[in-house]
């Protein structure tokens, strides 16, 4: 605090502040939620945390819901001890116990065990792999000079009018880019979790594709950490 704002804060003041804030945080964490959400995004960000005198990197998962009227709401923050179906089942049950009866679409990157947990807790919910993460994961293994062209080509997949057209474009692009030693296997292997995207119209796709709200939440969280 002194380095950032020029204000010296004593340990007693920190204790007094946290004693006041922690009950409010716990109340917020337990608050009732909407009965139904159109989309819930689950994404991770990482913080350096001091644990037993050692600085370790911890994952914090953010669940952000989009209501049936299009409003965005943070459902909760969850510290990730381990990714597993059991871990995600406990989180989804916690969300369910806070009043959420139905989620139409759950959108996330390939978090281990999440899809299985969704099937157990919300069996009618559709799981959708995050398109933005798919794009980023593909581009990170490509040379800088090829990234712009590949990013443009990938639009032929996720902007296709139908699932069939998107898949056909994917196969054609795989053939094209394999000659440059660029693999699109990640898209092919995950197609089952990508194809729900094509069931929806442009406006819904735009919401599913965009991660600005989640990214903004990550940014603000890291600003607080700093």
Specify the residue positions occupied by each region the protein language model found.
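Alpha-helix N-cap recognition
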Residues: 84, 162-166, 224
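Extended amphipathic alpha-helical interaction segments
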Residues: 119-213
